């Protein structure tokens, strides 16, 4: 997207005050903006795609009012729509019926907090009015029926299911409708045209013109027939067909080749194709055809499908009619034959001219969004149809007099369908909660996978590619790398979903070359009819275009210079084409798209730091994104802060009421990061409605703050930052600049077993008192205890199988009581490689009437927090896709320093920039330096004429905003670098070329060349070395191959693969190689003997035969090959399964069990 040159006059700039008004958020922190373009529209609520869809489903009052204001007469919610569809349910004779109406929800049973704490679902009871009518007697019985507990969406757009927060992702699917396509016949190179009628549910209907110029039809993907057979089956005579299609030689030729005479024969012909092997009759054939396309129960285009069909074919069938009509079929055929004949227009039934053209299935006019509400509605429809069957059966079996709606309805299938959807559907996902942007992006995600969507394997390049119709609807940048690229996207900043499920984007109306503030939302196919200018086209104060020719887009994304009078619309904002995460990348316009993609994705992986710091260089989106993420506390009404503590803020409202806001303290998020609230108001402060009163994770003063502003030098340093490695100053470790808190949850339960109940206790066999020192009298660790791997968190014993007791043992048992009973230590221990401090304990037990799963008597959860300082191996990244791993942490005194003695914090390599074409990071570096130092513009230089008054004199440490495609220009940065405020000595450390003279911290000598120095925003990513580093001593082995398992999760070993073996061979390290392949791996006997030899201090014995060799022999024998092993003298060696006696003897002597067999893991199968 082009950016207008700096010397052009653009729309009026915005001041700080007007910006606070424009954002509509009181108490917004100061951020001076380089934006030149006035935006007539505020960013909408970013969670509307989730919240409004669920409101539609439940028929919420707010949704109802909104729709009435938009002019809809009698809006019907999604739940009511399904109940209306299924009602009335009649019995087989039609003498009784049951109908549902007026769905309503009661109050939710428990708060969100309680649900998360006790593993419950945040749900409300759903009631409907059920009416049973006996048609024979006219008797009506009406009852309110409970349909089950229904999961309810929280204010943050999430669901709490079994105690975990989940998000239902919107699905991107092909819209129902009629689609024309053109292919090239392989044999004759002729263009062949076809059309598909795709319903929301029901059989497909396909027509095509083949290479022999005959028109055919395929019903429900069965064999092809001449299209005239279908027309005759619908009751058309040969004469009527001739008359209707007299203009088409193709269709008349098809009619000549069709030998069916009359409707009956045509019906039987269709029946034979659809039901081969069944005896055809006229009645069954007629019923079959009617059921396929003309019965609402079996076939439904849905409102959106009917809307698309009407629009494509110029029909005016009522939108409620979801079945096909005769007129539809005839018009579809006419359109197809005209398309084949090469015509470009046709007159529709309502006497309008419609274009004749093929459809692009990847166009956003033909792809729609199934939002949360619709996905749940489809699931309810499945559950209700199962209930319908039950109701029918009960109507016939129960006594008519005794029937009430309650006795007919079985609610179990509805509950099961909902549970299945929220628990196991591909679209109901565990919410991503690393930081606020991660959660916000997850809720705005568009997923083309899932039931009814595409599959990874089948999706080709076309469907993944960026399409012109994505502009302003789906972000062209933000998508995952890897197999899902292009299949998962993100909603653009201003986009919204209309009632049909199509994505709309806003435009400013242009009337006779003058831009107005009227906003129109257009769908992708409506937009194609208009010419749109970019948001940065220069306009005067009265809204007229300044230039004679304006850069604008036509259909298909073609860009050209156009007369202002020919322009219909103009973009609302330069960031309209990108998603929220992408809009948070400053200088995005200077970054290569591949790197911008990585930048947008890596922001979501940034872990919340101990102290958050907002970026010096932002884009102005930070405030809105943070508030809409729902992770901060926002005042509901204006008032005065009455009382303040770490975990409670009480506000006295202007109307005299009080409201207390609870703050989260050190909670665990779904991804183990720390969720903590911190008040940012004081007692006695006046606050306004909508003002942020407490920061959440990764926010500062209500703005998103994912990382830290660090002083960066861009230079190589002794090769330690080769290949994207990063060098850090030790100051960042000492001052906890990049320190984060991670919280792990450990859980254990005490169950009833066949041999008796398990017990949570401090009384653990064979464990010394010092190991139990931190456990309380119940056997649970105390809060505040420092723990490391292997430490006991909760003591638990499980009964062992008991044999018949001897008289002596019975005596002991009588004296010492239960203590002598055989029990096993099954305590909860800290997993391998983890350390930390116990910060919370939750105990649930049956005795306290807590709901627990069957067989569980007690459940204990322990929360362990870990403070992770930055260390070599951790991954850091900027916002431009510039990522790297810390290679070395240098003492502060060894870091390069500036002329005033300031050492830099971080050294990045210069080689990371040119090849990757993410120059945005260098511009950010310069603007970051400017923001930290402040500047004063003297006089009225040429480069500063587009800067607003608030940018003339900026104090040191002021945060700046450079919005995407409308930010600071290169010449402005160059000019400002020469206008920075001097330091105490009156000097400027960084010259106007953005470089500083640096000195080597070790020798004090200056470096030969000046170096680019400035402040860059650096994020600490979730890929921490503590989670990755791993070492194995003895551990589990695979059952079959007897080789160690792989992977950290299984406490596995490192795979010594084929190429590693070659390396050993190349160096002639024969003994090392033999050890690796035998006693360190799968020589079962050898490894026990080696252990014995090491313990006794003897020489290590000769290795035996590895288990994998025996497995190989067995494999060959299973192929009926007689394989023998021969010694050096040619005699046959008998392969015993294992030297059991030796093995058992050695193991018994040592008191060890080395084999610890485990079932083979996925890794094992792969390796």
From Swiss-Prot:
Coiled coil: none
Biased segments, Low complexity type: 9-23
Enzyme class: transferase
Signal sequence segment: none
Entry keyword Transcription: yes
UniProt cross-references to CDD domains, sorted A to Z: RNA_pol_B_RPB2
EC code(s) of this entry: 2.7.7.6
Matching Pfam families: RNA_pol_Rpb2_1, RNA_pol_Rpb2_2, RNA_pol_Rpb2_3, RNA_pol_Rpb2_45, RNA_pol_Rpb2_6, RNA_pol_Rpb2_7
Reaction it catalyzes: RNA(n) + a ribonucleoside 5'-triphosphate = RNA(n+1) + diphosphate
A single cellular component GO annotation: DNA-directed RNA polymerase complex
InterPro entries registered for this protein in UniProt: DNA-dir_RNA_pol_bsu_ext_1_sf (IPR042107), DNA-dir_RNA_pol_bsu_external_1 (IPR019462), DNA-dir_RNA_pol_su2 (IPR015712), DNA-dir_RNAP_su2_dom (IPR007120), DNA-dir_RNAP_su2_hyb_sf (IPR037033), RNA_pol_bsu_bac (IPR010243), RNA_pol_bsu_CS (IPR007121), RNA_pol_bsu_protrusion (IPR007644)
Cysteines paired by S-S bonds: none
Keywords: DNA-directed RNA polymerase, Nucleotidyltransferase, Transcription, Transferase
Biological process annotations from GO: DNA-templated transcription
PROSITE patterns named among the record's database cross-references: RNA_POL_BETA
Function per UniProt: DNA-dependent RNA polymerase catalyzes the transcription of DNA into RNA using the four ribonucleoside triphosphates as substrates.
HAMAP family reported in the protein's UniProt record: RNApol_bact_RpoB (MF_01321)
Stated family: Belongs to the RNA polymerase beta chain family.
Subunit structure: The RNAP catalytic core consists of 2 alpha, 1 beta, 1 beta' and 1 omega subunit. When a sigma factor is associated with the core the holoenzyme is formed, which can initiate transcription.
Protein's name in the database: DNA-directed RNA polymerase subunit beta
Organism name: Amycolatopsis mediterranei (strain S699)
Gene: rpoB
């Amino acid at each position: 997207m082009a950016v207008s040159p700096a010397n052009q006059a653009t729309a009026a700039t915005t001041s700080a005050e007007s910006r606070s008004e424009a954002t509509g958020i009181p108490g917004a922190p100061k951020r001076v903006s380089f934006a030149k373009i006035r935006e007539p529209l505020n960013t909408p609520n970013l969670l509307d795609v989730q919240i409004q869809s669920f409101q539609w489903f439940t028929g919420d009052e707010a949704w109802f009012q909104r729709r009435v204001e938009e002019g809809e007469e009698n809006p019907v919610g999604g739940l009511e729509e399904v109940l209306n569809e299924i009602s009335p349910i009649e019995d087989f004779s039609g003498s009784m019926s049951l109908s549902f109406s007026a769905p309503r929800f009661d109050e939710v049973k428990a708060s969100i907090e309680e649900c998360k704490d006790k593993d419950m679902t945040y749900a409300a009871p759903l009631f409907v009015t059920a009416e049973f009518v006996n048609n024979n007697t006219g008797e009506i019985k009406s009852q309110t029926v409970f349909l089950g507990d229904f999961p309810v969406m929280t204010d943050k757009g999430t669901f709490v299911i079994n105690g975990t927060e989940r998000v239902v992702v919107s699905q991107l699917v092909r819209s129902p409708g009629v689609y024309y396509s053109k292919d090239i016949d392989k044999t004759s190179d002729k263009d062949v045209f076809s059309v598909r009628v795709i319903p929301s549910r029901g059989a497909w209907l396909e027509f095509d013109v083949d290479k022999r110029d005959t028109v055919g039809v395929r019903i429900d993907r069965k064999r092809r027939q001449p299209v005239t057979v279908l027309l005759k089956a619908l009751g058309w005579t040969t004469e009527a067909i001739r008359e209707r299609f007299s203009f088409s030689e193709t269709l008349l030729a098809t009619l000549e080749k069709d030998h069916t005479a009359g409707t009956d024969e045509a019906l039987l012909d269709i029946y034979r194709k659809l039901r081969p092997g069944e005896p055809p009759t006229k009645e069954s054939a007629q019923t079959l055809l009617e059921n396929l396309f003309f019965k609402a129960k079996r076939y439904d285009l849905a409102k959106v499908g009917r809307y698309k069909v009407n629009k494509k074919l110029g029909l005016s069938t009522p939108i409620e009619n979801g079945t096909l009509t005769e007129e539809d079929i005839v018009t579809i055929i006419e359109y197809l034959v005209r398309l084949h004949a090469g015509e470009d227009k046709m007159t529709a039934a309502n006497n309008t001219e419609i274009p004749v053209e093929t459809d692009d299935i990847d166009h956003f006019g033909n792809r729609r969004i199934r939002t949360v509400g619709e996905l749940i509605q489809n699931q309810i429809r499945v559950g209700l149809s199962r209930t319908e069957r039950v109701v029918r059966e009960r109507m016939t079996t129960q006594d008519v007099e005794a029937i009430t709606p309650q006795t007919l309805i079985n609610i179990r299938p509805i509950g099961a369908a909902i549970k299945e959807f929220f628990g196991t559907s591909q679209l109901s996902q565990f919410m991503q909660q690393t930081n606020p942007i991660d959660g916000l992006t997850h809720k705005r995600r568009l997923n083309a996978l899932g039931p009814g969507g595409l599959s990874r394997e089948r999706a080709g390049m076309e469907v993944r590619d960026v399409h012109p119709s994505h502009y302003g609807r789906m972000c062209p940048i933000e998508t995952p790398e890897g197999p899902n690229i292009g299949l998962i996207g993100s909603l653009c900043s201003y986009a919204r979903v209309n009632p049909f499920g199509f994505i709309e984007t806003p435009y400013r109306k242009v009337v006779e070359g003058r831009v107005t503030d009227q906003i129109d939302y257009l769908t992708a196919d409506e937009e194609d009819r208009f010419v749109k200018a970019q948001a940065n086209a220069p306009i005067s104060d009265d809204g007229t275009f300044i230039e004679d020719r304006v850069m604008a887009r036509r259909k298909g994304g073609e860009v050209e210079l156009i007369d202002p009078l020919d322009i219909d619309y103009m973009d609302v904002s330069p960031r309209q084409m990108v998603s929220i995460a992408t809009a948070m990348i400053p200088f995005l316009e200077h970054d290569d798209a591949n790197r911008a993609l990585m930048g947008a994705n890596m922001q979501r992986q940034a872990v919340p730091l101990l102290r958050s710091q907002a970026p010096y260089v932002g884009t102005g989106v930070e405030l809105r994104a943070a508030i809409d993420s729902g992770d901060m506390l926002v005042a509901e009404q204006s008032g005065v802060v009455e009382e303040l503590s770490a975990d409670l803020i009480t506000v006295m409202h202007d109307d005299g009421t009080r409201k207390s806001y609870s703050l989260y303290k050190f909670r665990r998020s779904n991804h183990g990061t720390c969720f903590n609230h911190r008040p940012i108001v004081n007692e006695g402060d006046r606050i306004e409605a909508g003002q942020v009163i407490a920061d959440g994770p990764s926010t500062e003063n209500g703005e998103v703050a994912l990382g830290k502003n660090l002083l960066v030098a861009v230079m190589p340093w002794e090769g330690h930052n080769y290949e994207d490695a990063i060098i850090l100053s030790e100051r960042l470790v000492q001052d906890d600049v990049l320190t984060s808190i991670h919280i792990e949850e450990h859980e254990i339960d005490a169950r009833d077993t066949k041999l008796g109940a398990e017990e949570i206790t401090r009384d653990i066999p064979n464990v010394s008192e010092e190991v139990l020192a931190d456990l309380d009298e119940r056997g649970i660790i105390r809060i505040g205890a420092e723990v490391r791997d292997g430490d006991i968190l909760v003591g638990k014993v499980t009964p062992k199988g008991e044999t018949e007791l001897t008289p002596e043992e019975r005596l002991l048992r009588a004296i010492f009581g239960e203590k002598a009973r055989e029990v096993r230590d099954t305590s909860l221990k800290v997993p391998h490689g983890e350390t930390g401090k116990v910060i919370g304990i939750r105990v649930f037990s049956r005795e306290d009437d807590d709901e627990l799963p069957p067989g569980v008597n007690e459940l204990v959860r322990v929360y362990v927090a870990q403070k992770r300082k930055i260390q070599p191996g951790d991954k850091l990244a900027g916002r431009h896709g510039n990522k790297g791993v810390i290679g070395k942490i240098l003492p502060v005194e060894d870091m390069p320093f500036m002329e005033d003695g300031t050492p830099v914090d971080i050294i990045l390599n210069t080689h990371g920039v040119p090849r990757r074409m993410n120059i945005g990071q260098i511009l950010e570096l310069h603007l970051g330096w400017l923001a930290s130092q402040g500047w004063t513009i003297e006089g009225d230089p040429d480069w500063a004429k587009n800067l607003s008054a608030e940018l003339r004199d900026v104090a040191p440490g002021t945060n700046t905003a450079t919005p995407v495609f409308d930010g600071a220009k290169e010449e402005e940065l160059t000019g400002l670098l020469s206008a920075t405020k001097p330091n105490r000595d009156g000097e400027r450390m960084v010259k106007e070329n953005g470089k500083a003279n640096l000195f080597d911290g070790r020798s004090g000598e200056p470096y030969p060349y000046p170096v680019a120095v400035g402040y860059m925003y650096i994020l600490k990513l979730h890929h921490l070395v503590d989670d990755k580093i791993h070492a194995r001593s003895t551990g589990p082995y695979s059952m079959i191959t007897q080789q160690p398992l792989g992977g950290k999760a299984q406490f596995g070993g490192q795979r010594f693969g084929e190429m590693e073996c070659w390396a050993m061979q190349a160096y002639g390290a024969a003994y090392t190689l033999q050890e690796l392949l035998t006693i360190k791996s799968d020589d079962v006997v050898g490894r026990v003997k080696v252990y014995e030899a090491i313990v006794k201090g003897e020489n290590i014995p000769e290795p035996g035969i590895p288990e994998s060799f025996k497995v190989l022999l067995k494999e060959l024998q299973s192929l009926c090959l007689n394989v023998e092993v021969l010694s050096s003298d040619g005699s046959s060696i008998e392969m015993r399964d294992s030297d059991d006696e030796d093995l058992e003897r050695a193991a018994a002597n040592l008191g060890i069990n080395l084999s610890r067999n485990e079932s083979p893991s996925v890794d094992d199968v792969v390796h």
